Amino acid sequence: MPFYDNVYYPYPSDPPGTHSSAGIPSLLSSPQSQPSSGSQSRPAPSTMSGPLTSSGASTSIPPPFKFRSRRENVDWRRINAVDVDRVACEMDFQALQEHINAVTFCSVEGERCHRCQSPVDPALIKLFRLAQLTVEYLLHSQDCLSISLQAAEERLLAEAREREQICVQLQKKTQDAKALKEELKQRKKIIASQQAMFSAGISANYHKCQHCEKAFMNASFLQSHMQRRHPSEFDMKLMTDNQKKIQTVKLQDEINKLQEQLTLVTSQMETQQKDYTAKQEKELIQRQEEFKRQLEIWKEEEKMRMNSKIDEVKQACQRDMDSINQRNRNLETELLKLQQKNIQESMQSVQTQPNASTSNEHWQEVVKLQQKLHKQEVKWTGKMQKMKEDHDREKSLLQEELCKVSSAVSEGMEESRRQVQELSHRLQEQQQIITSQNKQMKQISSKPPTITVQREGVSTPSPETKAKVVVSEQSNSVHKLDPIVELSEEDKDSSSISESPTENRSWQKEVQELLKNPGLRRDMRLAAQHNLDDRLQSLGIKGVSGLSKNLYKSSMTQIISDRRKKLEEDPVYRRALKEISHKLEQRVKERNTEQPVKSKLHEQVVQSRPRSSSFPSTVTRVMSGPASKQQRTPQPVPRSRTNVPHKTSTPLQHRRTPPFSSDEDSSEEEEEEEEEEESSDEESPQMQKKTVLVNSSTAKAQNTAKTQSTAQSVRSAVALTSAEPTNVTTLSDSDWTDGSEMEEINLSQLHKHTDQNGNLKNVTHSNVKALGKSLEKQLAARGPKKPAGGVNTFLEKPTDVRNTRQNAKKELKYSDDDDDDDDDWDISSLEDVPAVAKPTQCPVPVRKSLDKSQDTSTSVWGSSTGKGHKPGLTDAGTASTLKSSLVTVSDWDDSDEI
């Protein structure tokens, strides 16, 4: 038998008819395997054989053969009880059958001799195991053979039974065939006799049945056949012809009656159907007419209700708008009164010279009041905008409802269309007015007044007799103006020299006339915002929203902590910062020494040209006394304080990335700012002194190169912020393009950090504090001396500066206390401006714009002549009074620690 991998695969069973499987001698199925008692029954198969099925067709092949494991112990008592010789002599196969499982599947490997306890010989064990495997294989072969034999026997029995059934059927068929043959013979005989009769010509005596195929030789036979086989037809035939006629007449009468009844019923049904349809049509017409009348009534009611609602909404909106406008006008009048009062008090304070503490408290109260007014205005403007949006939303909903009944309210729709046309016409007129006003503003901005700096002669170095800056006073009503118009350098220089006082006066008159229009500021602001958005979108800059104050604070605290950890842990980082700061300081010195000295003609007269079409901010005339005023040419003599003219643009500035420059340039500038600021802690006092002197001289040289600036008050703020490098971070001249933003500088905020002599107080910033102390120690011995020809650019009292916001810019606001909301981050600039420096004693509230329609920003530094400066020319430790609304997390400026 075939084996593979110790598994037996038997051959297929032999086809029926062969006796090879039956003829193979078996150990247990042989005739000698019968018990000695003489019983003729077959022995049962071995215990390994599975259950057999009843039929050969359903008999399944036994599972594949596999040798079993031997785990059973040897039952020596049963084996000792067997007499092997007797079994061999008597051929007792029954005893072998009883012990075959125990012998075949027992394990003798662990058996030992009972006497000496020695293990069994391995050769003997091998022989015994071989015998066990042979017996197991023979048992499996026996099972397979018995199964195949039983299946063959079952098939044989089934075929025998089928053979018997076929034999019985065959006998029945033969008998039926014999009977059919006899019947066929008889029919043939009858047919032959009938054909013979027909052919003999005896058709006259032939009578055929009309209802069947039979024919009779005699009429009597046919009649008897009719009575016997067709009785109904026979009775009908016996009836007379009269009876048939009478019956047909009756049937015809009944048919006629039924037809008449049918016609009558159909006519009645038709008339009823016509009446019913006519009635239904009348009812339907009446219902339609009634529905139309109800629909018309409903349409009229809806139309009246909608019109009443629209009128109510219009009246409510008009009342709200009137109340808001009235409140706004009241606030504006109060603001103007407060400003005039502040100006008068400032003039009185200049004459009386009150102490610094009372003036600071007074100005703090003024700033707080201004902030409150600004917040109220923002609040009311937001409410007004919300009400307008609600009104527009309700109006749209009402229009949608009106569209659903457009057939009934066509007149109302026409009226609304006329209103829309009128509004569009008004809007076009307003746009035309705005464009014309923009043109006028541009013309006016191209002709700014000439502002001359007059200073008094100083005979003593005492602080009380310092020369004050005397400038022309302008109107307080400064508003938003048109976008920036860039001029070439030659045009700037030529136009700045050729302007005269008459042009200044005419320019101021035109400005005042234009600003009398109350809706001008709002219209110009909207136009400026649209122009800025379009310009930014054309340049590929998408609109961004600024960070909130809480998010900014949390981000900056995390950045500062990470930066400090990095400085403490990594010495290489500290060393690299020192090296870079030293290199930057050297570059600053080289750049400052290379600045050319301008001609004295430009130093005599400081002319201001607005950077944009915005008007100059409010300027207060400051007088130090009745001393004679005369124009003197400032001499570039080194001074103890870096008091520079109003138009100076010193290198002590934080260069800022232009609004439309690449991110790589801005990142480089930020890195250089950080490195230069951190290098300030390592500078020696002597180096700081030299830097200040060089900056003051170069600032004078750059004075005449500036051809566009803001009003004189803004210039004084610029001079103050540039005088102490630890207080203000200014913008580079290259920032002021058509798409750049204008900054808002509150002069009162700056004067809160100054004393009576115009010197800046110490701030909380560590670098600023150290640098300020070093400068004070070096300059303490010199006292309050002012060099000959010097000009004091610091105002004794703060002036109210309102910056004009340009149409193409969004405002930058000062950093405030915790009450600042997300409105401080509404700028869409890409620049990072460090936060404002706070004083050491107490946080002074800063001024916010009082009126967004009036709150405008002006250029702090004027023309773009400083474009030659590279990013990174920043003063070490310079803090900022401005805060950008867009703060990047990667900003490494030291001023962020404030």
From Swiss-Prot:
Location of this chain's protein in the cell: Cell projection, Cilium; Cytoplasm, Cytoskeleton, Cilium basal body; Cytoplasm, Cytoskeleton, Microtubule organizing center, Centrosome, Centriole; Nucleus
Region (Disordered): 14-66, 435-509, 585-739, 773-878
Zn-finger (C2H2-type) residues: 207-230
Keyword Metal-binding: yes
Comp. bias regions, Low complexity: 25-46, 495-505
Ranges annotated as biased composition (Polar residues): 47-60, 435-463, 605-652, 685-715, 723-734, 855-866
Compositionally biased tracts (Basic and acidic residues): 797-815
Knockout mutant characteristics: Defects are a cause of reduced expression of Hh target genes in the ventral neural tube, similar to the phenotype seen in zebrafish mutants known to affect Hh signaling. Reduced cilium number in pronephric duct and Kupffer's vesicle. Defects in left/right asymmetry, characterized by abnormal heart location on right or center of body.
Comp. bias (Acidic residues): 662-684, 816-826
Coiled coil (residue ranges): 145-197, 242-353, 407-447, 573-590
One Gene Ontology term, aspect cellular component: non-motile cilium
Keywords, sorted A to Z: Cell projection, Cilium, Cilium biogenesis/degradation, Coiled coil, Cytoplasm, Cytoskeleton, Developmental protein, Metal-binding, Nucleus, Zinc, Zinc-finger
Signal sequence segment: none
GO molecular function: BBSome binding; molecular adaptor activity; zinc ion binding
Tissue expression notes: Expressed throughout the embryo starting at 12 hours.
Role summary: Molecular adapter that recruits protein complexes required for cilium assembly and function to the cilium basal body. Required for establishment of left-right asymmetry during embryogenesis. Acts as a permissive factor that is required for the proper regulation of Hedgehog (Hh) target genes in response to Hh signals. Acts downstream of the Smoothened protein to modulate Gli activity in the somites of the developing embryo.
Family membership noted in the UniProt record: Belongs to the DZIP C2H2-type zinc-finger protein family.
Name of the featured protein: Cilium assembly protein DZIP1
Source species of the chain: Danio rerio (Zebrafish)
